[in-house]
């Protein structure tokens, strides 16, 4: 499974969104994600990819998150 598809799956599950709403261009504001939602999404992604996502990263869109995961998973 590609990184985007797995990230999308986690966001859909954690935020209760339709997969069509979760695109690379979607911001977390667009997805109505508050800080607790984002924490849960990041926690699931860290577990799924066995990486650590630092809090100071400026991840505003799903695409930003996917790019970060791809870089860390290398």
From Swiss-Prot:
SUPFAM superfamilies associated with the record: ACP-like
Domain annotation Carrier: ranges: 1-73
Q: What is this protein called?
A: Acyl carrier protein
Q: Which residues carry this modification: O-(pantetheine 4'-phosphoryl)serine?
A: 35
Q: Does the keyword Lipid metabolism apply?
A: yes
Q: In which pathway does it act?
A: Lipid metabolism; fatty acid biosynthesis
What InterPro entries does the record point to? ACP, ACP-like_sf, PP-bd_ACP
What the entry lists under Gene3D superfamilies is as follows: ACP-like
**Could you tell me the keywords of this UniProt record?**
Cytoplasm, Fatty acid biosynthesis, Fatty acid metabolism, Lipid biosynthesis, Lipid metabolism, Phosphopantetheine, Phosphoprotein
Compartment(s) where it occurs, according to its Swiss-Prot or TrEMBL record: Cytoplasm
- Natural source organism: Streptococcus pneumoniae serotype 4 (strain ATCC BAA-334 / TIGR4)
The keyword Repressor is assigned to this record: no
Q: Could you tell me the Gene Ontology terms of the biological process aspect for this record?
A: lipid A biosynthetic process
Its family?
Answer: Belongs to the acyl carrier protein (ACP) family.
> Which cellular components does GO assign to this protein?
cytosol; membrane
Where in the sequence is the signal peptide annotated? none
Which taxonomic lineage does the organism of this UniProt entry have? Bacteria, Bacillati, Bacillota, Bacilli, Lactobacillales
Q: State its role.
A: Carrier of the growing fatty acid chain in fatty acid biosynthesis.
GO MF annotation terms: acyl binding; acyl carrier activity
PTM per UniProt?
A: 4'-phosphopantetheine is transferred from CoA to a specific serine of apo-ACP by AcpS. This modification is essential for activity because fatty acids are bound in thioester linkage to the sulfhydryl of the prosthetic group.
